[in-house]
């Protein structure tokens, strides 16, 4: 599971734009 910080950052960026 080496996709924690990178994936989380990418998801947060997408969710941030969607939640705009």
From Swiss-Prot:
Example of a GO MF term: rRNA binding
Q: A GO CC term?
A: ribonucleoprotein complex
Q: Which UniProt keywords apply?
A: Ribonucleoprotein, Ribosomal protein, RNA-binding, rRNA-binding
- On whether Ribonucleoprotein is a keyword of this UniProt record, the answer is yes
**Superkingdom in the source lineage:** Bacteria
On subunit structure and binding partners, the annotation says: Part of the ribosomal stalk of the 50S ribosomal subunit. The N-terminus interacts with L11 and the large rRNA to form the base of the stalk. The C-terminus forms an elongated spine to which L12 dimers bind in a sequential fashion forming a multimeric L10(L12)X complex.
Function summary? Forms part of the ribosomal stalk, playing a central role in the interaction of the ribosome with GTP-bound translation factors.
Protein family per UniProt: Belongs to the universal ribosomal protein uL10 family.
What protein is this chain from? Large ribosomal subunit protein uL10
Species: Citrobacter freundii
Q: What is the lineage of its organism?
A: Bacteria, Pseudomonadati, Pseudomonadota, Gammaproteobacteria, Enterobacterales
Name the encoding gene, please.
rplJ
């Amino acid at each position: 599971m080496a996709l924690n910080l990178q994936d989380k950052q990418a998801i947060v960026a997408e969710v941030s734009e969607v939640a705009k």
